[in-house]
Design a protein with these regions (language model features):
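Intrinsically disordered, low-complexity proline/glycine-rich segments
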Residues: 18-229
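Sec-dependent N-terminal signal peptides
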Residues: 4-14
Length: 229
């Protein structure tokens, strides 16, 4: 009798003393679901330049230059362009270009970018602040992935502000293994995928319903630059 009561007491202690898992089940965190995919509409008529509409956002046409009155001062710049991302309440300036990795010498970079040869090009995006955080600008640095990295969804870049970092990985899971077919760029916060984009002739976009409104705008801006790339 006493042994039975003791065992029951120990079981209760172990039950209530075990760490509580505060994470949602893995299935609930899957990004690639129908309800989180945004339809991408492309407007590319005979007499109009290409624009994109996805989710609540629309881009202007791409302008092939760095915008005036900005402080982008890289010495080596290739294929610069800029556009505006618009929703119902604001518009955000987005600029993009290619520049060698050496342009970021002296700046902190994650290991997967730091190890890139100095002359290798990086795709660079500068995103102006949103209405609620007008002074906070974001930048994205992205290297060109190797197909072996795509096979394993390896990190190839970073989207960051002064106090926030979002990892960017890339994979070919919608295409063929050992290939560059249907490269999907995935944005991750604390290891969880929160957005993804497949550029190209048949683009696809996913954005998690769990991200905050301001983060969603920044992700949408980065996605727009990758669609235009």
């Amino acid at each position: 009798m006493h042994i039975s009561l003791l065992l029951s007491f120990i079981a209760a202690v172990l039950c209530f003393g075990s760490p509580v898992n505060t994470m949602a089940p893995a299935a609930a965190q899957n990004l690639y679901t129908d309800d989180q995919e945004w339809k991408v509409e492309i407007n590319d008529g005979w007499f109009s330049a290409k624009t994109f509409h996805y989710g609540a956002y629309t881009t202007t046409a791409r302008k092939n230059s760095v915008a005036n009155a900005t402080n982008i001062t890289f010495k080596n710049v290739d294929n610069p362009f800029n556009f505006l991302l618009k929703d119902s309440s604001e518009q955000i300036l987005v600029q993009a270009l290619n520049t060698p990795r050496v342009s970021f010498s002296g700046r902190a970079l994650p290991a997967w970018l730091e190890k890139t040869p100095p002359t290798n090009p990086l795709f660079y995006i500068l995103i102006n602040g949103t209405q609620s955080n007008p002074l906070v600008r974001w930048e994205l640095l992205l290297k060109n992935p190797h197909y072996l990295e795509l096979n394993d969804n390896k990190p190839i870049g970073i989207l960051r502000s002064p106090d926030t970092e979002i990892r960017v990985t890339a994979h070919n899971r919608f295409g063929i293994v050992n290939s560059y077919e249907k490269v999907c760029y995935e944005f991750q916060i604390k290891g969880s995928a929160v957005a993804a984009v497949i550029p190209g002739e048949q683009p696809r976009v996913w954005v998690s319903k769990r991200v905050k409104a301001d983060t969603e705008k920044v992700l949408a801006a980065a996605i727009g630059a990758l669609l235009f790339r």
